[in-house]
Amino acid sequence: MLSRRSLFAVGGAALLLNGCAQVAPEGGPPLMDVIGSDPNLSSFRAALRSSGLASELFDRPGIYTVLAPTNLAWSGAPERIRNGDREGLLNLIAGGRLSLASIQARGGRIRMLGGIDVRVVGGTAESPRIQAARPGQAPSGTSASIIRANVMASNGVVHVVQGVLIPT
């Protein structure tokens, strides 16, 4: 007979595994192909290419999480970022494959390669609102909603966002 404690343990383990199970199959498309397949991410893709990050990061071994702004969101970003500013772009990329469930399990915090933190500050479980923060500080500056999460690639995951995160 199963005890209540055993049922909770099994349920918790199942939820944990579900958050980790969203991995692209071996040989699936790489991040740049996933980003390139969505015409609504073409401006972001062009900036990754012009900055050199597309080849520097995504054409080499490594797993990444990308917060990819839509073309509309990208058009509202500062010109330096739209033109391929590496620091601004690195603030949209994190190391590791972080599904939405993984982000939520980490308390809604992600450290980006550019050194900023991104935190969940509201929204819903399916479409959280995120905001940038300088390390050790409260979130500030622009925020964005994740409008399509967990787009898996062989070398990471893409979350499509309606904004470009810039801490103030």
Please tell me what each predicted stretch does.
Residues 2, 8, 20-168:
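Mature, structured domains of secreted/extracytosolic soluble proteins
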Residues 11-12:
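Sec-dependent signal peptide hydrophobic core
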